[in-house]
Amino acid sequence: MSDTPSPWVARWAGAIAPYGRVLDLACGPGRHVRYLASRGLRVTAVDRDREALAQSRGIAAESIEADLEADAWPLPGRQFDAVVVTNYLWRPLLPAIAACVADGGLLLYETFALGQEHFGRPSNPHFLLRPGELLEAAQGLHVLAYEDGVAALPDRRVQRLAAWRPRGADPPRLQ
């Protein structure tokens, strides 16, 4: 697994409030934890894989081991200046993920979509977004950018979203 952050996350990281609190959900070995922490952000890393999570201990401000698909939501009532989700989809969590975005905060989401089965794994439609599904999940947020197509290196079918929760202030500065 590459340690390089997703270009989508890197593109939008500058719009996260300085010294902000960031949730990296289903963080895996922590490529985004490391990248975001290096930018001075306080990252909460959540994953079910203890060994993967251990790779970001000492870097993340907080590490939470949780099986997001079997356990109760591990962050009730908590909100973050940004929520980052990449290469992960569990539809029952979509409302909780959006609810974690604080006023003035960002949701950065990038994962596989229908059509991915032509490029490789995942190929199970239960783990692939339907057309427009990520936009539906962001209801109540202001969409700053949305992409739905084939990303390169490696080729994969994805949907990407950057969305902001208005707080009555100006939207984040775009990079």
Where does each model-flagged region fall?
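Core SAM-dependent methyltransferase catalytic element
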Residues: A152-Q175
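A short, conserved alpha-helix within the catalytic core of class I
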Residues: L89-C100
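Class I SAM-dependent methyltransferase SAM/SAH-binding core
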Residues: R31-A70
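Conserved beta-strand signature within the Rossmann-like core of class I S-adenosyl-L-methionine
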Residues: G105-F112
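Class I SAM-dependent methyltransferase "Motif I" SAM/SAH-binding loop
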Residues: A26-G28
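A short acidic, Gly/Pro-enriched loop at the edge of an enzyme's catalytic core
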Residues: P74-A82
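Short alpha-helix
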Residues: H126-G140
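S-adenosyl-L-methionine
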Residues: M1-A17
